[in-house]
Amino acid sequence: MIKNLNTRKLAVTPSHKKAMMRNMTTSLFLHEQITTTIPRAKEVVRFAEKLLTKAKPADLNAKKAIYADISNKDVVKKVFDVLVPRYKERNGGYTQILKLGTRKGDSAQMAIVKLVI
C-alpha cells in the first residue's frame, strides 16, 4: 500500500534524492538559477522555498536549520546576507520555473529554475 504520494520519486533512492535536493538547492542559491528537468525543478522549488521561509527570522535557530541542509558556509552566508533581506516583504513565491523545451539526447523536458529578484 503506497501512502506517500505527495512527492515525486525521480527514479532514485530516498537518500540519493535528499542529497540531490540539497546539492541542487545549494547551486540555486549560489548561482541564482539552474537548468534541470521539469520534475526535478518542481521538487527543487518545493525544497528551496521551505528553506528560504525557515531562514527568514535570521536568528540562531534559523541558521542552524539552514546549516542542517546546506553545508557550504559561503552559500549560507549569502542566504542570510543577500537572499533573506531581498525576500523580507515577500510571503513565498521566491522561485520561478521557466520551461525550455526538450533536451537533445533523450528528449527530456527541461526547465530553468531561478530566484525571483
Residues covered by each model-derived region:
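Ribosome large-subunit tunnel/peptidyl-transferase-proximal elements
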Residues: 1-91, 104-117
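Short, solvent-exposed loop/turn elements at beta->coil junctions and helix N-caps
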Residues: 98-103
